[in-house]
Amino acid sequence: MPGKQLSDPCVDCSDAEAILTLRTRRLCQTCYARFVNFKVFKRMENYRLRRNMPKTGPCKLLLPLSCGISSSVLLHILNAQIQLELAKSHPSPGFDLHVLVIEPSSISHSSPSYDEGFGLLQQTFPLHSFTRIPLHSIFELDPELQEVISQFSKDGFVDDAGLSAKERLDAFRASIPTSTSKVDVDYVLITRLVVAFAKKIACRGVLWGDSDTRLAAKTLANVAKGRGSSLTWQVCDGMSPFGVEFNFPLRDLFKAEVDNYASFFPELTRIIIPDEPPSENVLTKNLSIDELMMRYVQTQGEKYPGVMANVTRTASKLQASLTPANVPQCSFCGAFMLNSGNNGGGDTTGASRALELCYACTRSRPELTC
C-alpha cells in the first residue's frame, strides 16, 4: 500500500510535513529540534566526556537562568541530554548541573516576582539543583564589592552602611547616569555575582545562554564601549580572568532558531518571562549601546545571516595574550589592564589607593560627562 503523500516533506526524514525553514532547508518539528540539540551536544562534548579533566569525582557546572528564552532553552536541551546519558548502561562521566536564578524583580522593577516560575522550574527539571538569590546578595557573596562601589562613583554616590543591602545597591545603580553605563554596570554586577556563587559551590565552569545573535551584538557593543580586550572571555569559550571557565553552548544557533525551538515545548512557555517588545517611539539617544547593537544585529541578521554569524566566528578566534603575573586587574569588572599606566582610571591617594579601573569602567563613572 503506497505511503501517505506529503505536500511538503521534511528534507531530512521525508516522513513528516515540513513546518519551518532552517538555513534554506525545510524541516519537520522533530528534525528541527534534533538539529538544535546536536549543536549544543557538540559544544558540551568536552564536559560530557571530560576531556583534559579528571574522569572521576564531581564536575559541577553553573547555568545562570535569566528566565529568558535562550537560557531556558539551554536548560531544556541539557536536561534532555543528561536524561539520555543516564539511561545508558555505560554512561560517560558527564557533569552535574546547578541552575542559578537571580530574582528578576531585583534587577528591574518592571519585572514580576518569579515565585511561581521558580516552583515550576523545580517541578519540570527535577534532576538538577536550583538556587534563587536577589541581585543585592552580591554584597554577601562578593564582599570586596562594597569598597569598590564606594570609590567607583566618587562624589556621585555615598555608600551608607546603615542601609539594607538592597537599598545600598539600588542607590549605587541609581547614581549611574547614562543608559549605556547603567547596562554596562548591571552586566558587571551580574557577572560578579554569578562568578562568586560558582566559586562558592565549587563549579568548574559557567554555561551562559547566549545565542550567536546575542554574542554578535555583545561583540560590537563591547568594542564600542572600550571592552574589546575582554572579548576573549566575554564571547569566547575558555578560562575567564576569575579562574572559572566560561562557555556558550548556544553559540552556533541564531536567536530565531532558539525561539522556534522554544515554541515546540509548552513547558517552556510556563517558565519563560517574555522579552518586552522594542518600542518604536524611543529616541535612539535614549537607548544604550547594547540595545542599539542588539536591534542592529537582529534586523540585519534577517537580511544577511551569514555576515552576522561571521562577527561571532571572528571574535571566537581571538586568543588572550600571555599575561604577566604582575599585571593588575580592573577592580570593578576584573579585566586585565595591560595598559594600566594610561587608562586614567586609577586612584592613587588615601583610601582609594587600591582602586584601579580599566578604560571602559572609567567611562561609566558618574562624574565623567564627556
Curated annotation (Swiss-Prot):
Its main location: cytoplasm. Keywords: Cytoplasm, tRNA processing. Signal peptide: none annotated. It holds the Pfam family CTU2. GO terms for molecular function: nucleotidyltransferase activity; sulfurtransferase activity; tRNA binding. InterPro entries: CTU2, Rossmann-like_a/b/a_fold. One of its GO terms (cellular component) is cytosol. Belongs to the CTU2/NCS2 family. This is Cytoplasmic tRNA 2-thiolation protein 2. It comes from Neosartorya fischeri (strain ATCC 1020 / DSM 3700 / CBS 544.65 / FGSC A1164 / JCM 1740 / NRRL 181 / WB 181) (Aspergillus fischerianus).
